[in-house]
Amino acid sequence: MSAPLTALGPDPAEPLPRAAGLALDLTGRTALVTGAAGGIGRACALRLAAAGARVRAVDRAAEGLETLAGEAAALPGDLEPRLLDLTDLDAAEASAAGTDILVNNAGLQLVRPIEEFPPDVFHTVLTVMLEAPFRLIRGALPHMYGQGWGRVVNISSVHGLRASAFKSAYVAAKHGLEGLSKTAALEGAPHGVTSNCVSPGYVRTPLVERQIADQAAAHGIPPERVLSEVLLKDAALKRLIEPDEVAEAVLYLCTPQASFITGTSLTLDGGWTAH
């Protein structure tokens, strides 16, 4: 009789315990993170500051930035809250001057069928999630080129690789961001600058939590069924990814070991795009 099968490790559907994380000293480097007041941006700002970077934390939410600054006070790197609305494109570009590491993260979401999608919201989504990253990269590259080193990390999404119904603006913006990131990689390579996307699936963030009601209305189901029947229906790992997990991937792309990685997308989707 064969022995019964035993588990070979932790349940992949459960988040792993917090580990020490990557060891990387970013002392002397300046990082800029957009959408830093919450979610993925907050996690990235704190992780980079923990590695010693001077972090410009950009957001339009003053209260969230104030909370973030308090959380970062004991970390090795300095964190500077910067109140900025990314629809002010000239100000966005100017804010990126002198940046060594740029994390384009800010985003917004509205779930509606195309025929009901407000054109002004579509325009705002594309402005914040595609045109602003272009302007920020444009503002950061002269300094990066001048010193022969730079890291551009664009927080994309599985929706930069695949489409979903009712998300026309978000999907269009993320697909555009993937193309912008690849172009920056090709242009930046001779100057020591890498550009990559980190493309997570559904992350435990306020943005995802806010869209559950919209998804329920769009699909005609109760909100409590959205996670299992819509968001995670096609994922192999049936859980939301944590913001800290995304931040570790961002940090990895700033390590010397990742210097040959450019023009690609690091997908953290629990197998969502394997179909």
Where are these regions (language model features)?
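C-terminal substrate-recognition "lid" of short-chain dehydrogenase/reductases
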Residues: 134-137, 141, 149, 237-268, ...
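Active-site helix of classical SDR
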Residues: 137, 173, 181
